[in-house]
Amino acid sequence: MKIGPYKEEEAFLSPRIVIFHDVASEGDIEMIKTRSTPRFKRATVQNYKTGDLETATYRISKTAWLKPEEDIRISNIYRRVASVTRLNMETSEELQVSNYGIGGHYEPHFDFARREEKNAFASLGTGNRIATWLFYVSRRFIYSKIDSQGFFRKNVL
């Protein structure tokens, strides 16, 4: 693990998968959750043949999109990701916030367009994806036994 402005942990060598710690604060995450929750809609995927967005049984989640110009904190997150990855964020997509909830899932898939998906990102004007950045946020549950009758659950971040 490297120590710097952000902690870097190499999780896998090939393909290279890196975990960066402390890029988003708890305050950043709370702001993202507050802004995205009222916007959540059933997630869609792009049909590679038609280019249309549609729901799919292999992706069960709710999704919202946040623009960097909506809040200086979102803009700062983009800046930090650019700093860590050394990638230009000008052609990146909006910040996608997904909630998989109970029973939600996304089956294995590609985040880049394959050869047969010639116009996958045409409407965005961004070109193909070269990297995917994920902030993984989950609630942890602590169960405390109460009089041998059941369990008590506390939400802890």
Q: For the regions a protein language model found, what residue spans apply to each?
A:
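Fe(II)/2-oxoglutarate oxygenase catalytic core
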Residues: 1-157
